[in-house]
């Protein structure tokens, strides 16, 4: 796998460094503003830089496009890349509407391209192992997930400067940027809920700076909290009749966990694989799926991405419905 990068946002250098740690070559960068892209090109010695997206897609030095743009742009740039015959890795959220998600999945299948959403928990062996741990705690009753982090852009926003991360037109807000991690964590394990209700704190421009999402399942409730206007320790807690599982980290990471057994009154560490570099693992796993042409796994993941976008869309609709 050789990668061409799209964008120059905060996530891009982080992703490039993870790729380099995974010994994945980055050969090109597209950025609308050449001056903003130049420092990235120089720092990581990327051989080709473009401001014309079609010229970028015509570059045969890479086979995979990584899209690190604002949320609302994911769909169109991913679509164009697939139509150009490139594999695509899209940062979360996959898309901002369900129709967009379904179209991208159909296009990837039609054009025999591999398509992925970059969401860390999905590529964690420990997350997969969690499914075995759930059996040990009995009937699930409550799930709580929290990812609250004061945004580096929030001070500007409070002064009246609207950046994409706090702009509804760009798919910004706490639901799309942070609560998506919580939703992925829950939906990846339990599928679609039967009901979704979102209770946001809305700013004057209508964007949600924080909020609580409730997902109702047949036998339990999942409460997902996210904030870009305040900070608290992240966690995931899964409460069941015979025990409780706790992960004291953001839902994207599954690196340490404890399981409490109500019947024995004992708490044990969950047996996990040491994953000190989740993003490196993510790209290595994606590379493996591309190299082995494992479309079955790709499609299974895309179904989960589509489910997550379904929840996001229903959450936004629930605000309008009151």
Region roles according to the model:
Residues 103-120, 141-142:
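Rossmann-fold dehydrogenase core element
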Residues 5, 15, 44, 48-107:
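Beta-loop-alpha module in the N-terminal Rossmann-like domain of NAD(P)-dependent dehydrogenases
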Residues 121-193, 322:
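Predominantly a Rossmann-like dinucleotide-binding segment in NAD(P)-dependent oxidoreductases
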Residues 90, 115-117, 247:
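Hydrophobic residues in well-ordered beta-strands that form the structural core
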Residues 183-253, 284-289:
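Contiguous beta-strand/loop segments that form the cofactor/metal-binding neighborhood of enzyme cores
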Residues 64-66, 285-322:
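C-terminal helix-rich "cap/oligomerization" subdomain common to oxidoreductases
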Residues 1-44:
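N-terminal Rossmann-like dinucleotide-binding module
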